[in-house]
A protein has these predicted regions:
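Pocket-flanking alpha-helical
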Residues: 30-33, 50-57, 199-202
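Short, solvent-exposed loop/beta-turn-alpha elements that line the ligand-binding surface or hinge
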Residues: 1-6, 57-61, 73-83, 133-143
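Long, aromatic- and glycine/proline-rich binding clefts that accommodate carbohydrate-like moieties
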Residues: 69-70, 122-179, 207
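Alpha-to-beta junction loops
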Residues: 37-46
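Beta->alpha turn/N-cap motifs
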Residues: 28, 45-50, 87-89
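Short helix-initiation/N-cap motifs at beta->coil->alpha
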Residues: 21-36
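Extracytoplasmic/periplasmic substrate-recognition and gating elements
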Residues: 11, 16-19, 57-125
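Glycine-centered hinge/linker elements that transmit conformational signals in sensory
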Residues: 1-24
Length: 207
């Protein structure tokens, strides 16, 4: 459904890259370094890059010089979009562990999301904590996300957990994107890798 929009975004990337698109597959390029040296205006990444990008060192910025904006690729209504938000990680407790270990784990999980010390650690080292009375992180990217949300913008969610055989599926898509970007391959091959590849991996996992 959104493959043309994906193409719009991908073409925007490669046609405005700091290097020749034909050279991108050669490797050795550092988008963060290019961004830090002001060779690039935009740099696609996530909130986890905040600590690397902020500071007083070479290639780092002050808090007032960074911001995060949504993806725009021609989807109807995207002017009302906020930042993409998702995760591929979940907390879990092993039911087969010793009872005292299970309880200790549950106690720790409660402590880390409710106590002043625990939520401060989360805010400073990991980012936002979606619990009442949690500390607010300094990460400006989270502040941007909250601003969009407060304004009523919708969130595009993602969760790699639901991608069937994510590494195999992703490898097929990356290969097709590389052929398209470097060797003038067909976008139809990207569509096939994305759509049919997903169906193939889903069938393998679910019968």
């Amino acid at each position: 459904t959104y493959m043309q929009n994906y193409k719009n975004l991908w073409d925007l990337y490669i046609n405005n890259s700091a290097v020749n698109p034909a050279d991108l597959a050669a490797g050795g390029f550092d988008a963060a370094d290019e961004f830090g040296k002001e060779q690039a205006v935009f740099y696609q990444n996530g909130s986890w890059e905040w600590a690397k990008l902020t500071g007083t060192g070479d290639g780092q910025y002050g808090l007032d010089n960074l911001s995060m904006i949504p993806f725009y690729c021609g989807v109807a209504g995207e002017e009302n979009a906020g930042l993409n938000c998702g995760t591929e990680n979940c907390w879990a407790v092993n039911k087969n562990a010793k009872e005292e270990d299970i309880q200790a784990t549950l106690d720790f999980m409660k402590w880390v999301v409710t106590s002043d010390e625990g939520t401060t650690m989360l805010a400073e080292q990991f980012g936002p904590c979606p619990f009442k009375n949690a500390k607010t992180p300094e990460n400006v990217f989270f502040a941007d996300a909250n601003t969009y949300t407060a304004a009523g913008n919708y969130i595009v969610t993602w969760a790699f957990n639901w991608t069937p055989a994510v590494n195999d599926w992703r490898a097929g898509v990356v290969d097709a994107l590389t052929q398209y970007t470097v060797n003038g391959g067909s976008w139809d091959d990207v569509k096939t890798a994305f759509v049919d590849g997903w169906a193939t991996q889903y069938a393998k996992e679910n019968g």
